[in-house]
C-alpha cells in the first residue's frame, strides 16, 4: 500500500511506502554496513530546543550517484534500480540550454555546463550557470513534492566557491578534487529520539515503461577495502606545511591585514596519518568523544568522509533561511566552577566578541543578496554552546527569502563560512588559493541534504 504519491513535472511518478521499525533496535546497525556498502549515516549528538534535535538518518545502496569536477558533471547508476531512474532523468537534464551531453551509456551520463557568457548582478550571481545548474533542473522537476527526506544527500567541496567567486586558480587539481559528491537514495531510515519512533521510507520511481519496481539493489561495483585492515599505525602524523613555513604565511597574512588588504584570512594546514581499521570504528569514536549537532559518515566507495561539526552552515525551510556563525572558543574546566570562570573570560574577551561580530556581519550581508529587506534578524547573540571539551560563542541569524529565490540560492550565497575563509570573503579565498599548497577538498565545505521539497539542511 502506497502512503504517498507524487507526479513530477515530466510525469515521473514517485510512490512512497512508510514502514515503522523497532525504535529499541535503532538504525545504527547501518554504521557497520557502511564499511562495505555505499551510503551515509548522519546523526545529532546534542539537543537544542531552538535549533537541533537528536535525529538519526541513514541509507545504504543508493541507486544513483552524482559526482562533479571542474569540467564535468557525472550521474551514475550504482545498481539495477539506478538504470531506469537515470533514463528518466536524462531528458529533463538535456533539455536545459546550459547543459551539454559529453558522453553516455546505460549506467553513466556525463554532462558539461556552459560557462557564464555575461556578468551577473550581485543579487543574481547564484543563478549563473554552474555545477548547480543540473541540480536546479532536478529540483525544478520535483518542485512541490511534500516529502521531508527525499533529495540529494552528500558533501560539497571547498572549490565550489570558485564557481561563485570566479578567479584564477594557482594550484593544480586532480580527480580527487571533487566539487560535490551526492547520492539520491531510495530507502531512507529515520529515527526521532524525542518522539521515540523510527521509520523506513521506501521509494519507487515510474515513468511510462520505465520503472524501479522489482529491480535489484546489488551494486554494480564494490567498495574499496583497506589494504592491510589488521595492521596498526605507527602514529606518525605528517603535514603539508612545516611549522616554520606555516608561520611565515601567517606573518604574511598579518602584513596584508596591517596594510588594509583584508580584515581576516583563515589559513589551513593538512594533517594525515595512517589508519587501517574499519571506518565505522573511527565514526563511533568521534561520536563518543565529540558529540555534535552534525555527525556524519559518508561511504563514497573510494573514500570515506567522517566528521563531527558544531556549526550549522545553512538551513532553509519554506522562505526562512537560517545560519549560526561560530567564533570564540574556551576549553572546558575540570568542574563547574572552572567552567563558569572560563565562560566569563570568554564573554569578556574583546577579540572573540569583535571576531564573531565580523562573522555575523558577513553572514547578514550574504543573506541580503536573497532576503527581503527588514527580515534579517539576530535571534541569539553570543550564546554559549557546550560541547565535550569546549565552549563556543554562537550567533543565530535568520532571514526571509525574496520571491524567486530558493534553497540553492541561499546555499550558494553563503559559501563558505567566514570562520574558515576570512573577510572580505572574495579577497580571503584568493589569498587561500595563492598561498596554501594543497587544495582544501572537503575541508571548509559542507555536508547535508538538498531536499526535493525545497528544504536545505547543511
Could you describe each region identified by the protein language model?
Residues 1-458:
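Extended alpha-helical targeting/anchoring segments
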Amino acid at each position: 500500500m502506497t502512503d504517498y504519491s507524487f507526479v513530477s513535472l515530466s510525469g515521473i511518478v514517485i510512490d512512497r511506502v512508510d514502514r515503522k521499525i523497532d525504535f529499541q533496535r535503532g538504525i545504527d546497525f547501518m554504521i557497520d554496513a557502511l564499511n562495505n556498502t555505499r551510503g551515509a549515516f548522519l546523526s545529532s549528538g546534542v539537543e537544542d530546543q531552538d535549533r537541533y534535535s537528536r535525529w538519526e538518518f541513514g541509507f545504504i545502496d543508493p541507486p544513483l550517484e552524482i559526482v562533479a569536477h571542474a569540467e564535468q558533471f557525472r550521474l551514475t547508476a550504482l545498481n539495477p534500480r539506478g538504470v531506469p531512474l537515470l533514463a528518466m532523468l536524462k531528458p529533463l537534464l538535456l533539455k536545459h540550454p546550459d547543459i551539454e551531453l559529453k558522453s553516455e551509456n546505460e549506467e553513466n551520463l556525463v554532462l558539461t555546463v556552459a560557462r557564464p557568457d555575461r556578468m551577473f548582478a550581485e543579487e543574481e550571481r547564484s543563478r549563473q550557470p554552474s555545477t548547480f545548474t543540473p541540480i536546479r533542473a532536478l529540483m525544478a522537476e520535483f518542485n512541490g513534492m511534500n516529502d521531508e527526506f527525499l533529495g540529494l544527500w552528500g558533501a560539497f567541496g571547498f572549490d565550489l566557491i570558485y564557481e561563485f567567486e570566479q578567479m584564477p586558480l594557482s594550484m593544480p587539481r586532480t580527480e580527487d578534487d571533487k566539487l560535490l559528491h551526492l547520492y539520491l537514495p531510495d530507502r531512507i531510515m529515520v529515527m526521532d529520539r524525542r518522539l521515540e519512533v523510527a521509520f523506513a521510507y521506501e521509494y519507487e520511481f515510474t515513468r511510462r515503461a520505465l520503472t524501479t519496481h522489482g529491480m535489484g539493489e546489488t551494486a554494480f561495483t564494490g567498495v574499496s577495502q583497506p589494504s592491510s585492515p589488521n595492521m596498526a599505525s605507527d602514529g606518525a602524523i605528517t603535514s603539508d606545511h612545516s611549522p616554520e613555513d606555516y608561520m611565515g604565511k601567517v606573518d604574511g597574512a598579518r602584513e596584508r591585514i596591517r596594510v588594509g588588504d583584508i580584515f581576516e584570512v583563515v589559513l589551513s594546514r593538512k594533517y594525515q596519518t595512517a589508519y587501517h581499521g574499519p571506518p565505522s570504528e573511527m565514526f563511533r569514536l568521534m561520536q563518543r568523544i565529540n558529540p555534535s549537532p552534525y555527525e556524519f559518515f559518508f561511504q563514497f566507495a573510494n573514500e570515506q568522509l567522517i566528521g563531527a561539526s558544531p556549526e550549522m552552515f545553512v538551513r532553509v525551510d519554506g522562505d526562512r533561511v537560517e545560519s549560526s556563525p561560530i567564533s570564540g572558543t574556551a576549553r572546558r574546566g575540570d568542574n563547574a566552577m572552572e567552567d563558569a570562570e572560563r565562560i566569563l573570560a570568554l564573554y569578556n574577551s574583546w577579540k572573540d566578541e569583535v571576531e564573531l561580530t565580523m562573522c555575523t556581519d558577513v553572514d547578514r550581508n550574504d543573506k541580503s543578496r536573497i532576503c527581503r529587506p527588514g527580515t534579517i534578524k539576530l535571534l541569539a547573540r553570543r550564546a554559549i554552546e557546550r560541547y565535550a571539551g569546549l565552549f563556543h560563542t554562537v550567533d543565530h541569524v535568520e532571514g526571509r527569502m525574496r520571491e524567486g529565490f530558493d534553497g540553492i540560492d541561499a546555499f550558494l550565497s553563503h559559501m563558505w563560512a567566514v570562520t574558515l575563509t576570512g573577510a572580505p570573503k572574495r579577497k580571503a579565498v584568493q589569498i587561500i588559493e595563492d598561498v596554501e599548497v594543497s587544495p582544501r577538498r572537503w575541508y571548509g565545505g559542507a555536508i547535508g541534504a538538498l531536499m526535493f521539497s525545497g528544504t536545505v539542511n547543511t
